[in-house]
């Protein structure tokens, strides 16, 4: 219950609070420390909706967090869930949109000829992931070049949907997204980890895209949010648009 006798009054002094704890430090299952899993968010929102229904009260849900993982087109399970949740009863959902516009973590383009994205990787990066999102109907030839000039072509139709490459002293784990009934975007996910030592190769990494067959030709590259990488790591020619953190893209 908000304090009614305080000198300062907020926008809704008569409001009651439902506080739902999400995420635990040291969570198992690969979740970032302290950051909730998608399932925990779904359960927390569901609990708040049910509680508001039991009390016959309007509900405002505040989700003051987010990350850069996703296609940013509103098609993910979490984004669609929040869209549907906002239509239940008298419900308003407020989601933080982050502050990633100047963090150099996003690059986008429309491929009509050979395109490239140059990524600066700073010193002492223990690992780094890159998301490439495109339309499933588009077929690109994708090449990755290391700072030392070693180059590899990324196969996008391999059986099993995952494989490993090595460029210099960096191992690249490649995961190919599968079609989903509710999404037309395909994800190609790259995880860079050191082969020896503690850090991946620093310098300029180049991603080259060559169109083979295009329908939309649009592509989007995302890095982890700024607090998940060094200040000197980012795209040289970044795209500040569509840098809202997920799930504010719902």
What are these regions (language model features)?
Residues 4-250:
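Loop-rich non-cytosolic ectodomains and luminal regions
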């Amino acid at each position: 219950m908000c304090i009614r006798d305080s000198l300062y009054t907020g926008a809704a002094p008569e409001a009651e609070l439902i506080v739902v704890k999400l995420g635990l430090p040291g969570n198992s299952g690969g979740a970032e420390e302290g950051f909730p899993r998608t399932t925990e968010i779904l359960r927390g929102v569901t609990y708040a909706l049910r509680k508001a229904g039991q009390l016959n009260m309007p509900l405002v849900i505040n989700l003051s967090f987010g990350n850069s993982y996703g296609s940013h087109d509103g098609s993910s399970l979490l984004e669609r869930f929040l869209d549907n949740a906002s239509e239940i009863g008298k419900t308003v959902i407020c989601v933080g949109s982050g502050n990633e516009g100047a963090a150099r973590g996003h690059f986008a383009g429309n491929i009509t000829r050979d395109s490239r994205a140059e990524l600066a990787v700073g010193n002492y990066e223990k690992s780094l992931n890159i998301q490439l999102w495109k339309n499933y109907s588009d077929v690109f030839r994708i090449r990755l070049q290391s700072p030392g000039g070693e180059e590899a072509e990324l196969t996008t139709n391999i059986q099993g949907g995952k494989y490993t490459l090595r460029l210099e002293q960096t191992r690249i784990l490649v995961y190919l997204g599968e079609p989903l009934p509710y999404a037309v975007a395909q994800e190609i996910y790259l995880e860079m980890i050191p082969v020896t030592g503690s850090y991946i190769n620093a310098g300029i990494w180049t991603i080259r895209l060559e169109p083979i067959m295009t329908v939309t030709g649009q592509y989007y590259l995302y890095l982890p949010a700024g607090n998940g990488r060094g200040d000197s790591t980012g795209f040289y020619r970044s795209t500040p648009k569509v840098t809202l953190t997920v799930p504010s893209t719902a």
